[in-house]
């Protein structure tokens, strides 16, 4: 199956990434990607863009050259309370909010602490997708996190980059997560976690996890732009009607 949606990308606004937004748009057009989210790292990361970068995402057109662009962030989970580094009314101006553990912000601790932080973040209502929860540096109670995510309509990510250049050893955890989310009745999403435009929409390894878990396609948010937009609308994000022209094509 060809997946037309990517929820996790980084531009040169995060200085360890290497492509501009315009290069992503061109690559999306080339690959047939209909909708992607620009989700640079939250401001607590050392090389992340300033807080105002995310506030000013409102200047971005919703659709450029037939490609839909979601205004987003990959926020950092800061502590066991589940707080993230983007807050207040500004969250409501974003189309999509991702959050995950990153070592410069939240040092690896223990299974109980990681699990509590993720569940508290999920229950906060501020985050739509938890990124790379299969990271072996942050062991979690997978069943408990999957249950909390399902109960709060939050998706867990199968991160394709985890199998390539980072977070080595994630395969076992990601398969367990896919199976647990399936059992809990929750949602999954595949994210490229692209740091260069060439990787946009590359879910090669993540797809293998989805297939091995026999995960139901109707609960995979990448299955269509309509599916992702319906999820985000249900999560309370407004202004998504501006993508109607995209859905008509």
From Swiss-Prot:
Family statement drawn from the similarity comment of this UniProt entry: Belongs to the PHP family.
GO MF term set: phosphatase activity; zinc ion binding
Listed InterPro entries: Phosphatase_YcdX_put, PHP_dom, PHP_phosphatase, Pol/His_phosphatase_N, Pol/histidinol_Pase-like
Binding locations of Zn(2+) 3: 74, 102, 132
Residues that, per the record, bind Zn(2+) 1: 8, 10, 74, 193
Superkingdom of the source species: Bacteria
One of the Pfam families matching this protein, by short name: PHP
Gene Ontology annotations of biological process type: bacterial-type flagellum-dependent swarming motility
The protein, known as: Probable phosphatase Spea_1436
Enzymatic class: hydrolase
SMART domains: POLIIIAc
Alphabetical UniProt keywords: Hydrolase, Metal-binding, Zinc
Note describing how the cofactor binds: Binds 3 Zn(2+) ions per subunit.
Listed GO CC annotations: cytosol
Cofactor(s) listed: Zn(2+)
Membrane-spanning ranges: none
Classification via NCBIfam families: PRK09248.1
Positions annotated to bind Zn(2+) 2: 16, 41, 195
UniProt EC number: 3.1.3.-
Cross-referenced PANTHER family: PHOSPHATASE YCDX-RELATED (PTHR36928:SF1)
């Amino acid at each position: 199956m060809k997946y037309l949606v990517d929820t996790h990308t980084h531009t040169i606004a995060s200085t360890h990434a290497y492509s501009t937004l315009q290069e992503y748009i061109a690559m999306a057009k080339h690959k047939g990607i209909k909708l992607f989210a620009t989700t640079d790292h939250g401001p607590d990361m050392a090389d992340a863009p300033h807080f105002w970068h995310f506030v000013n995402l409102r200047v971005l057109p919703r659709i450029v050259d037939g490609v839909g662009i979601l205004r987003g962030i990959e926020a950092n989970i800061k502590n066991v309370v589940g707080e993230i580094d983007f807050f207040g009314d500004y969250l409501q101006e974003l189309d999509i909010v991702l959050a995950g553990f990153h070592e410069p912000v939240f040092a690896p601790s223990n299974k109980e602490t990681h699990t509590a932080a993720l569940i508290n973040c999920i229950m906060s209502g501020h985050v739509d997708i938890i990124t790379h929860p299969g990271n072996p540096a942050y062991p979690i109670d997978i069943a408990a996190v999957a249950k909390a995510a399902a109960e709060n309509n939050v998706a867990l990510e199968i991160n394709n980059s985890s199998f390539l250049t980072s977070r080595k050893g994630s395969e076992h955890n990601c398969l367990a997560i896919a199976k647990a989310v399936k059992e809990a009745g929750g949602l999954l999403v595949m994210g490229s976690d692209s740091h260069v435009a060439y990787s946009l929409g590359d879910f090669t390894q993540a797809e293998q996890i989805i297939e091995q878990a026999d995960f139901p396609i109707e609960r995979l948010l990448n299955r269509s732009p309509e599916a992702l937009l319906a999820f985000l609308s249900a999560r309370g994000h407004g202004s998504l009607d501006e993508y109607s022209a995209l859905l008509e094509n």
